Design a protein with these regions (language model features):
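Short amphipathic alpha-helix that is part of the acyltransferase structural core
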Residues: 1-40, 157-192
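A conserved beta-strand-loop-helix scaffold within acyl/acetyltransferase catalytic domains
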Residues: 29-46, 65-73, 190-235, 240-241
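A short, internal acetyl-CoA/4′-phosphopantetheine-binding micro-motif in the GNAT/acyltransferase core
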Residues: 54, 68-70, 79-91, 240-247, ...
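Conserved hydrophobic beta-strand within the GNAT/NAT acetyltransferase core sheet
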Residues: 80-82, 117-121, 237, 271-275
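Short glycine/proline-centered loop/turn elements that form peptide/ligand docking sites
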Residues: 256, 279-282, 299-304
Length: 306
């Protein structure tokens, strides 16, 4: 059967949506199982519309790929998400999609100072492990999905001098959140640099709830934040951080407790978060607040064009 990979335009998004919701891919693409989650991901400020592809076999949609292009220190990195439905696997579809992504990314490597190409998948997935190895990727990181059993949440103990407000949509709140995020995550693995406009896009997405974003201020400066997200039944502590000058005072724990309580009050089932498996301080905090590792996400990397 002829295998064709072509760009995924707006007219192809229904096919991508249907593929992502195939039972063989639903677990890997949980966010895409709801309309709000699908729309938000396709409108992500770091997912260019020209970095999406659809593969067909004999005219039938068989798989897809899309690539996030994330700005970071000194350049950017690409994270390619790929899916091939079960009945079309072991037919070269994944390899063809990766080749299309790599060719497009290689063409813009110098323009965007692209440093690396990444793949990821939930464990266990022996097929993905083998695919990554065959295509020259090396395993570089594990990220963990940690879940917390429903139950009593400790009351946030806000440090002295800290005032917490939910997001009010003002330019001041937007700028404070964006600045605090960049300062909090600048030293993290795969830090994604965010502009004010990037953050504005996030606050306009379907999942965003102003009352689900807490901003912690010391005097007039935003020094911490916790943003929650809902896609269907689960609830995620999607983004939590403190600026370097506000660490070690209990602010992170207080924000985490606020986020968990907000999600439980919103009837989220389960409550979860994602964490870098090598972020020991965050892991200690999350475990001490009742979170346990539920799933492991494998990350692989290679140079663009290899």
């Amino acid at each position: 059967m002829p295998l064709v990979v072509h760009p995924c335009g707006q007219q192809h998004l229904p096919s991508l949506r249907a593929l992502a919701r195939d039972p063989s891919l639903a677990h890997e693409f949980a966010q895409l199982q709801t309309d709000a989650g699908f729309d938000d991901m396709m409108a992500d400020p770091f997912l260019p519309v020209d970095l999406r592809w659809i593969a067909t076999r004999d005219g039938e949609p068989a798989g897809f790929a899309f690539s996030f292009l994330a700005p970071t220190h000194g350049g950017s990195f690409a994270m390619v998400r790929m899916g091939v439905v079960e009945r079309h696997r072991r037919r070269g579809v994944g390899s063809a999609l990766l080749a299309a992504a790599d060719a497009t990314l290689t063409a813009i490597r110098d323009r965007d100072h692209l440093q690396e190409l990444n793949l990821s998948a939930w464990e266990p997935n022996p097929a993905a492990v083998g695919f990554a190895a065959r295509h020259g990727f090396r395993h570089v990181r594990n990220f963990w999905r940690m879940e917390r059993p429903l139950g009593t949440v400790g009351k946030p103990q806000w440090p002295a001098g800290i005032v917490v407000r939910t997001y009010d949509g003002s330019d001041r709140a937007l700028a404070g959140f964006n600045d605090a995020y960049n300062r909090a995550f600048a030293s993290h693995y795969h830090y994604v640099r965010s502009s004010l406009e990037d953050t504005r896009v996030i606050t306009a997405q379907r999942h965003f709830r102003p009352d689900g974003l807490a901003l912690a201020y010391r005097e007039d400066e935003c020094v911490g934040f916790c943003r929650n997200a809902r896609y269907g039944d689960p609830g995620e502590v999607a983004l939590i951080g403190t600026v370097p000058e506000a660490r070690g005072i209990g602010l992170g724990r207080a924000l985490l407790r606020w986020g968990v309580a907000w999600l439980q009050d919103d009837f989220a089932r389960p409550v979860y978060l994602m964490v870098d498996g090598e972020n020991e301080s965050a892991l200690r905090l999350y475990r001490s607040e009742g979170f346990q590792v539920a799933l492991t996400r494998l990350h692989w990397s290679r140079a663009i064009g290899d």
